Amino acid sequence: MAYRHFERFCNGKCKFGELTIKLGERYMMYLTTQARAMKPRYERLGTNTAAAYFAVFKKVLRIAYQERMIRENLADRLGGIPKREKRKEFLTLEEVKQLAATPCQYDVLKRAALFSCLTGLRISDILKLRWEEIERASDGGWWMRICTEKTETEATLPISDEALELCGEVHGEGVVFAGLRRCMIQHPLHAWIKAAGIRKHITFHCFRHTFATLQIALGTDIYTVSKMLTHRSVKTTQIYADLVNSKKRESANRISLR
C-alpha cells in the first residue's frame, strides 16, 4: 500500500537519480495533505497512517544507499511525520456479553466481531482466514496457522472452543467467514453496537484492543498476550497493560471514607 501511494505521487515514474531531499519533503507534504485512502471511502489518510507510509519510504531510501543505488544517505537527512497518540477504546467483558446477546443485521458480522474479541485477529486477517489454516492439535484443541496481512508475520495461534463455534460449520476448505464484507464494518456495525446500548465509539479494530485488555485484566502475562497479538515487540503490548492499570487506579479511587 505504501508503494502504491508513492506510485500515485510520482505518476508511476521515478528514477533513483531523481531521489532528492526536496522530493522527499514534497512526498511528505503529499501524504499529509493530499493522499487519499485506497478504500473503503477514499478518505484523507490519517496522520499515523501517513507517518507509517513515510517511514517505509525512508527505509527504502536507506536500503538504496546501502546498496549504492543512490550516492547520498537521504533517509538520515529527512525528518518524519509525528504520530498522534490515539486513545485505544475497548469493551468490558460485560459489554462484550451485551453484544453477544444483541441481534445484528448480518450474522456473519456478529460472528466475526466476537471472534476478534476472542482471538485478537485484525479484520484484514479475519477476511482472508481459510479453513485450510485451521487444524486440530494433538491435545484435541484447535490452532490456526496464519500469515498476518499487516506485518506479514507467520504465527500459530490457539482457538478456543467458543471461538471455533463462531466460525460456523467446520469445512475442509474455503473462506471461514464467507459473505463478510468491509462495508459491513461501517454503518451495520455501528447500528449493532448502538442497539446493544453501548455508547462508546467502537470500530472493528477495537475488538482487538478488547481481546488484549481483557486477557491482561484476567491475568494472562504480557509476553503471552504479545505473542497472541503477533507483536514484534512487547513494548507495543505494554500499552494495553497501562490501560488496565489506569482502570484499576480509577476503581481504587471510587471507594472513599471521606
Language-model features and meaning:
Residues 2-25, 33-76, 122-124, 191:
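N-terminal DNA-binding recognition helix of tyrosine site-specific recombinases/integrases
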Residues 18, 77-80, 86-89, 93-94, ...:
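Conserved tyrosine-mediated DNA breakage-rejoining catalytic core shared by Y-recombinases
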Residues 43-47, 51-53, 66, 70-123, ...:
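Basic, Lys/Arg- and aromatic-enriched nucleic-acid-binding interface segment
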Residues 66, 114, 118, 125, ...:
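C-terminal catalytic core of tyrosine-transesterase DNA break-rejoin enzymes
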Residues 90, 148-152, 182, 229-254:
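Catalytic-site neighborhood detector that most strongly recognizes the C-terminal catalytic loop/helix
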Residues 98, 155-158, 169, 242-258:
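DNA/chromatin major-groove-contacting recognition/catalytic segments
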Residues 133-140, 199-200, 220-239, 246, ...:
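Short, polar N-cap/turn motifs at the start of nucleic acid-interacting alpha helices
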Residues 160-199:
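Active-site/catalytic core of tyrosine-dependent DNA strand-transfer enzymes
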